[in-house]
């Protein structure tokens, strides 16, 4: 990646949670100073012309676990997008797992294009007319289950750090690549995780699905595979990393996962092993980040009491976190973005963007007609 792009990264880091990042005049040496928040006084890390700035930033990330800009922490990343999508709708519809069913089994939080409905086939991007995402050519839909507090009040979503002004709740979406990739084709869909995951051992196998108990919006704390066991000062951060190797044939599979293969080993943004012969096509690394604002319920969480939060599918451990994806980029726009080394964060030459006040005008109708907010006596779809 060019010095100019790493200079852009430095701009994002300046002043973020006690971090100062500067380039030398020649753009070949990145110096990052960490504040005393690490407990040992200021620390300065320097990348020489012979070392990789991404490697340096990965070190910082593992020391501090405090940046939402994780895209920049992988070495090497040749192109990538990071952008926000405001919330589109919250209702019991799932066109991937339960196509045609209205309602579906549990409530989902959905962002993206307005073609979203109970039945979605073919080229979604060709049917949508607007999107809640900053990338104006992205009419995909992204969704996850939705958590509630223990007495079934829906937990609100709040903005992640370093998103476009006006982003309302929603998700942070990443598309990254470390080598030449093939963009998802029209009609493609997949899921990651499962609401039936019920044990710690099962959850640990989903390496790309993790939580963080936010100390501040930029200080995440350690990753965990289940819900935090104590109140989080700034909310609960959930991340979903999808597999990035495709069989090259099927747009979907009966379990919505077998047509993909996961090469994530440790860090969710790193796909080091090559794709296997059974799934030879490397696709973009897709990631969702969501910040659940659990802070309004912290005073209702007695000291020493179990975690009160429950996913909309009735999961209280957090093990069953999962996410769905329906590809809907217009034409070859995603392929162009992944081909361009200057694509970084939300800036990418010919890829069109929109202001979030325009994105926030995009809506879909309530297709189920049930109450999902306020103090409920039971989870929607789970009434006895």
List each language-model region with its residue ranges.
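Primary mode marks residue(s) on the alpha4-beta5-alpha5 output face of response regulator receiver
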Residues: 80-105, 109-240, 247-384
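Intrinsically disordered, low-complexity regions enriched for glutamine and histidine
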Residues: 2, 60, 76, 104-106
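Fungal secretory targeting signals
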Residues: 56-81
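Compositionally biased, intrinsically disordered/low-complexity regions enriched for serine, proline
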Residues: 39, 46, 50-51, 73, ...
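Residue-level detector of alpha-helical transmembrane segments in integral membrane proteins
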Residues: 35, 42, 46-47, 69, ...
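Intrinsically disordered, low-complexity basic segments at termini and long loops, enriched
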Residues: 1-63
């Amino acid at each position: 990646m060019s010095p100019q792009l790493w200079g852009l990264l430095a701009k994002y880091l300046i002043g973020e949670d006690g971090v100062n990042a500067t380039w030398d005049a020649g753009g070949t040496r990145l110096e990052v100073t960490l504040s005393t928040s690490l407990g040992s006084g200021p620390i300065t890390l320097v990348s020489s012309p012979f070392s990789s700035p991404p490697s340096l930033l990965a070190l910082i990330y593992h020391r501090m676990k405090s940046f939402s800009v994780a895209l920049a922490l992988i070495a090497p990343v040749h192109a990538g997008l990071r952008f926000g999508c405001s919330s589109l709708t919250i209702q019991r519809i799932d066109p991937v797992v339960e196509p045609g069913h209205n309602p579906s089994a549990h409530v989902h939080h959905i962002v993206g294009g307005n073609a979203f409905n109970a039945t979605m086939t073919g080229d979604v991007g060709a049917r949508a007319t607007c999107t809640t995402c900053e990338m104006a050519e992205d009419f995909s839909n992204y969704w996850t289950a939705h958590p509630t507090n223990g007495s079934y009040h829906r937990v609100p979503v709040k903005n992640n750090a370093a998103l476009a002004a006006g982003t309302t709740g929603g998700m942070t979406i990443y598309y990254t690549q470390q080598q030449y990739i093939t963009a998802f084709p029209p009609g493609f869909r997949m899921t990651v995780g499962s609401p039936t995951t019920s044990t710690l051992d099962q959850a640990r196998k989903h390496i790309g699905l993790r939580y963080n108990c936010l100390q501040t919006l930029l200080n995440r704390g350690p990753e965990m595979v289940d819900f935090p066991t104590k109140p989080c000062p700034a909310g609960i951060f959930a991340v979903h990393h999808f597999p990035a190797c495709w069989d090259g044939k099927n747009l979907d599979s009966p379990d919505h996962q077998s047509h993909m293969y996961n090469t994530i080993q440790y860090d969710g943004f790193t796909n080091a092993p090559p794709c296997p012969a059974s799934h030879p096509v490397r696709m973009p690394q897709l990631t969702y980040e969501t910040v659940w604002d659990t802070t309004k319920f912290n005073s209702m969480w007695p000291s020493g009491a179990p975690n009160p939060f429950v996913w909309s599918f009735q999961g209280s451990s957090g093990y069953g976190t999962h996410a769905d994806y329906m590809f809907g980029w217009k034409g070859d726009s995603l392929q162009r973005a992944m081909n361009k080394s200057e694509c970084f964060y939300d800036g990418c030459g010919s890829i069109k963007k929109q202001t979030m006040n325009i994105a926030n005008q995009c809506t879909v109708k309530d297709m189920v007609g049930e109450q999902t907010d306020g103090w409920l006596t039971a989870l929607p779809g789970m009434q006895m």
